[in-house]
């Protein structure tokens, strides 16, 4: 039988053999590439931590009533209509009755604008605090972290917030540090996607992702009702996550990250202009949200 097959093969036209090989080789290469692509490095969530101010923190919890009373008493630039509107939003916001505010907002007589130093202190207290909690929770050595990604949409300073993390925890010299800003509420999720992509390329590595916002530098003091939402919905807070692709962590991981899907709608003028960081007619800086946000968000989902 083998002899017959060999004889048939020897009698084939060499040009025909070449043609067949040319036809099937790309298909074989494509099949191999597809199989190899499917063998991406799995990425897992080792653990996470959410920030809560410690007893000695300068940050304080205020009730909704305290927030409104402060706005009436010390918000010299707020009109009665603005404070009444804030009170209605707070009642329907879904936030708990006690939420945390930075030192610049809880002092007896807040000053406007607050200093950059106070804003930096808020970010450092939140970021350093939540990272310390996460490292203690996971018993991870900071030197083992190979990737650091920090997200803060509205506060961008030099040195960057990610550089502050590297300096504070004395991370290693080859750590890959990224600072993400201006991405709004999707920034944290985009950072998770970035961490996943990096971990699929760099083997045996831990990625630290931190997401927060800064209130000290972004409290709106004007009377444009479309810009008052920041004061009502945003509070002091932050979250830190450790993602891993290390096989040694498999017995401790909580979840596997299967997919990270981003929908980019900035090419749409409607979406692009739905949220803006800008100054109002009186020069007060804040976040303006218009009615197109709901439409844009619905299309993205």
Predicted segments, located by residue:
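Structural signature of cysteine-dependent C-C bond-forming condensing enzymes
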Residues: 1-4, 132-146, 171-176, 199-209, ...
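Terminal signal-anchor or tail-anchor transmembrane helices
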Residues: 1-40
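Hydrophobic alpha-helical cores of multi-pass transmembrane domains in eukaryotic membrane proteins
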Residues: 19-25, 153-154, 211, 234-236
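Solvent-exposed alpha-helices and their adjacent loops that cap or buttress functional pockets
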Residues: 36-37, 141, 170-172, 184, ...
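Hydrophobic pocket-lining "lid/loop/helix" segments that shape and contact the acyl-thioester
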Residues: 42-69, 76-87, 91-93, 97-104, ...
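Conserved catalytic cysteine-centered active-site region
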Residues: 93, 98-100, 121, 152-205, ...
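Short glycine-rich or small-residue beta-strand-to-loop segments that form or flank ligand, phosphate
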Residues: 145-153
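Structural beta-sheet core signal
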Residues: 150, 208-209, 242
């Amino acid at each position: 039988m083998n002899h017959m097959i060999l004889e048939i093969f020897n009698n084939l036209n060499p040009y025909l053999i070449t043609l067949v090989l040319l036809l099937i080789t790309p298909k074989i290469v494509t099949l191999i590439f597809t199989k190899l692509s499917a063998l991406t490095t799995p990425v897992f969530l080792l653990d996470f931590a959410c920030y809560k101010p410690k007893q000695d923190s300068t940050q304080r919890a205020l009730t909704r009533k305290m927030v409104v009373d402060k706005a009436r008493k010390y918000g010299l630039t707020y009109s009665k209509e603005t404070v009444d509107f804030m009170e209605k939003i707070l009642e329907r916001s879904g936030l708990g009755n006690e939420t945390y505010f930075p030192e610049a907002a809880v002092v007896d007589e807040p000053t406007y604008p607050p200093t950059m130093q106070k804003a930096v202190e808020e970010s450092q207290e939140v970021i350093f605090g939540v990272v310390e909690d996460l490292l203690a929770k996971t018993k991870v050595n900071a030197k083992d972290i190979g990737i650091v990604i920090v997200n803060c949409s509205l506060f961008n300073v030099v040195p960057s917030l990610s550089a502050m993390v590297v300096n504070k925890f004395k991370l290693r010299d080859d750590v890959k540090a990224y600072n993400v800003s201006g991405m709004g509420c999707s920034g944290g999720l985009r950072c998770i996607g970035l961490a996943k992509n990096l971990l699929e390329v760099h083997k045996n590595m831990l990625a630290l992702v931190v997401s927060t916002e800064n209130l000290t530098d972004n409290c709106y003091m004007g009377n444009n009702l479309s810009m008052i939402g920041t004061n009502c919905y945003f509070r002091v807070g932050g979250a830190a996550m450790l993602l891993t692709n290390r096989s040694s962590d498999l017995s401790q991981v909580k979840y596997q990250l299967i997919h990270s899907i981003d929908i980019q709608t900035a090419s749409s003028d409607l979406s692009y202009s739905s949220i803006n960081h800008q100054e109002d007619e009186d020069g007060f800086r804040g976040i303006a949200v218009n009615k197109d946000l709901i439409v844009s968000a619905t299309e993205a989902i």
